[in-house]
């Protein structure tokens, strides 16, 4: 098990692009490999990280019960707030240590030891993005950097890598460097201005994102 003690799975979104499936269930509970997207995510994380926290919003009561049954340590209701609200407004804001952050629609295989080693090598920045090579059919935020210091993030200009939805961040340090951000994009740009946003040289061993029912069906044909 890595020395990273905390992970956050962001799972509060409505999953509009997966309607009508998400009319009755929240997106994180979409069926995957005999279980659900978020149950598999929690199970994988639990092999490496002892404390797993989940943000919920849409159909929050249903999802909260599900993730607690799956072993989540705590649940934060962020309904009506931005995706980075929890960084500034929950007990996690005081953590002065690396926290692994993922989104519920990422299916990923990570080498946590390598990732943590890379974070230490970069002098434990306020935030380190974990990138992937662009995948055809999946939109993303392209990352531009100079010696791993991020200089720009763009959805228009293309680069060799884009955000995977995975990052390692230090909540207390972010609160010291930034004012409360409207979303992660705003948070990142505040960090860029301070020279405090880094990008990892370690990529996920396997990675896929689920934005549509078609992508979910495709992933279920060859799960990992």
Q: What spans do the regions from the language model cover?
A:
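Short alpha-helical oligomerization interface
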Residues: 23-28
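A structural signal for short hydrophobic beta-strand segments in well-ordered beta-sheet cores
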Residues: 29, 142-145, 200
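Conserved beta-strand termini and adjacent loop/short-helix elements that scaffold enzyme active sites
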Residues: 55-57, 75-78, 129, 153, ...
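Acidic-glycine-rich active-site phosphate/pyrophosphate-binding loop
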Residues: 65-69, 140-150
């Amino acid at each position: 098990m890595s020395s990273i003690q905390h992970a956050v799975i962001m799972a509060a979104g409505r999953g509009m692009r997966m309607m009508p499936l998400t009319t009755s269930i929240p997106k994180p509970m979409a069926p995957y490999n005999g279980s659900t997207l978020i149950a598999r995510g929690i199970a994988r994380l639990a092999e490496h990280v002892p404390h797993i926290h989940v943000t919920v919003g849409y159909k929050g009561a249903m999802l909260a019960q599900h993730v607690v049954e799956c072993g989540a340590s705590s649940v934060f209701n962020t309904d009506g707030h931005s995706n980075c609200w929890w960084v500034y407004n929950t007990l996690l804001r005081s953590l002065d240590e690396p926290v692994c952050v993922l989104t519920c629609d990422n299916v990923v295989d990570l080498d946590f030891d390598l990732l943590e080693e890379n974070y230490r090598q970069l002098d434990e920045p306020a935030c380190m993005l974990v990138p992937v090579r662009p995948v055809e059919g999946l939109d993303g935020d392209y990352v531009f950097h100079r010696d791993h210091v991020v200089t720009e993030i763009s959805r228009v200009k293309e680069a060799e890598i884009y955000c995977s939805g995975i990052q390692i961040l230090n909540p207390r340090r972010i609160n010291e460097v930034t004012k409360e951000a409207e979303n992660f994009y705003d948070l990142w740009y505040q960090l860029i201005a301070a020279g405090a946003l880094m990008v990892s040289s370690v990529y996920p061993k396997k990675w896929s994102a689920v934005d549509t029912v078609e992508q979910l069906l495709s992933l279920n044909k060859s799960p990992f």
